[in-house]
Regions:
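Secreted/periplasmic carbohydrate-active enzymes, especially glycoside hydrolases
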Residues: 1-129, 134, 138-142, 170, ...
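Substrate-binding/catalytic cleft of secreted carbohydrate-active enzymes
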Residues: 109-112, 119-340
Length: 409
């Protein structure tokens, strides 16, 4: 596939920065990319002069996948329904602070996969490009979030046209930089910056530039100390006429923060709204939290419009220091211990609860029979190794393994 540079440069545009041309080619039956099957290809772009000499060449890994909402509310990747088993992630390292080394990013992604997470939100700014490469490779869905936040000013700047360019520049920069990563399925316009015309403008640009992904924005405002959604309507009330956000065409999902289980059920069953409901922040993991995490997921699996959410958050924002007297190391933090893992990536008990709830292979024992149910979209049971133990009073009675040849998909 080739195109002469002259074909591009001779077309007339009013401004140079809008100079563009699309190259299109049909790829027959590619292996599709998903969180379960992160199949990647390498595309190579070569620029040659009029004599055929190579002037420049660039390569990039890409993946083929389709993201959509079927039946208006079912999140589907390649036609298969998906739930967001997600977590919010800040850039943080116990030794280097906000300068996160590559090996720590690898550790984050592998731990997320190990404990059943399939998605991450880059709260509240785009991540290091290397992090997206890892998500592409390992299979992690990404909500890529622009660094637009006016927490404390509520919607003041989102309704001020003087701030539109600054906000638009940050969103556009993120989308243009990260657009080739198959792991990114959501563009997020920012965080906690209220409802306003600037939000709608940013969303419109994103949808025009990249119609292949979904647009997210959780816009909340404060009123008398309580969270208010939509046109000042408390979403917990049963007579609410609108939900967050109030520009229905602008975003693809109703997003909420820290709702109760009853709250998300009310959002998911409200009349006059068909969009899916996502908890972009929930299950605040400070201390020994997540005690009712199962109840949230019982609701998610019961009510069709609920698609999951992102736990707050992944890693404690603390740094390792040495005691001046004893010389012992300790974690120093100013109230930033909200993570499922410690700052050095040692796990906390709550993350095991997540692994249990998110597991895609279910075991049901009744009437002397064990039923194994596979909830993966692409991975057959033969992909896994099964071992078992029979215990009585804490003592091992017998153990064994099940041959994968006897397991159906």
């Amino acid at each position: 596939m080739s195109m002469p540079v002259k074909t591009i440069t001779t077309e007339k545009y009013q401004q140079n920065f809008s100079l563009a041309k699309y190259l299109e080619a049909n790829v027959k039956a590619p292996l599709l990319w998903s969180s379960e099957t992160p199949n990647l290809y390498i595309i190579v772009l070569t620029l040659k002069d009029h004599k055929g000499n190579v002037v420049e060449a660039r390569s990039s890994r890409i993946g083929f996948r389709k993201v959509e909402f079927k039946n208006k509310h079912e999140l589907c990747v390649n036609g298969k329904r998906e739930y967001i088993y997600g977590v919010n992630r800040h850039d943080h390292d116990a030794w280097e602070g906000k300068t996160v080394p590559y090996e720590r990013m690898v550790q984050d992604v592998t731990l997320m996969k190990r404990f059943g997470f399939n998605s991450v939100r880059t709260s509240h700014y785009p991540a290091d490009p290397a992090f997206y490469d890892l998500c592409d490779e390992y299979g992690i869905y990404v909500m890529d979030e622009a660094n637009v936040e006016t927490c404390g000013a509520d919607a003041e700047l989102s309704n001020n046209e003087l701030w539109l360019f600054a906000q638009m520049e940050r969103v556009a920069g993120m989308v243009k930089r990260d657009k080739n990563h198959p792991s990114i399925i959501f563009w997020s316009l920012g965080n906690e910056s209220g409802v306003g015309a600037n939000n709608a403008a940013r969303a419109s640009w994103v949808k025009d530039y990249d119609p292949t992904r979904l647009v997210h924005f959780e816009a909340y405002m404060h009123n008398g100390g309580s969270r208010q959604y939509g046109y000042g309507i408390d979403f917990m009330k049963t007579n609410r006429p609108a939900v967050n956000p109030p520009e229905p065409p602008a975003v693809d999902v109703v997003s909420t923060m820290y709702p109760s289980v009853e709250g998300i059920i009310k959002l998911a069953t409200q009349e006059g709204e068909t969009r899916p409901v996502l908890m972009c922040e929930y299950a605040h993991a400070k201390g020994n939290a997540l005690g009712n995490h199962q109840e949230y997921w019982n609701a998610v699996k019961k009510y069709p419009r609920l698609i999951g959410g992102y736990i707050w958050d992944w890693v404690d924002q603390s740094v390792i220091r040495k005691d001046s007297v004893t010389g012992k190391e300790y974690f120093s933090s100013l109230n930033g211990t909200n993570g499922l893992v410690f700052a050095d990536r040692k796990i906390k008990p709550a993350i095991n609860e997540c692994k249990k709830i998110y597991q895609h292979i279910r075991f049901d024992y009744s009437n002397g029979e064990l039923t194994i149910r596979n909830e993966y979209n692409y991975l057959p049971l033969s992909t896994f190794r099964f071992s078992w133990k029979l215990m009585a009073g804490g003592e091992l009675i017998k153990k064994g393994a099940v041959s994968y040849t006897h397991l159906r998909a």
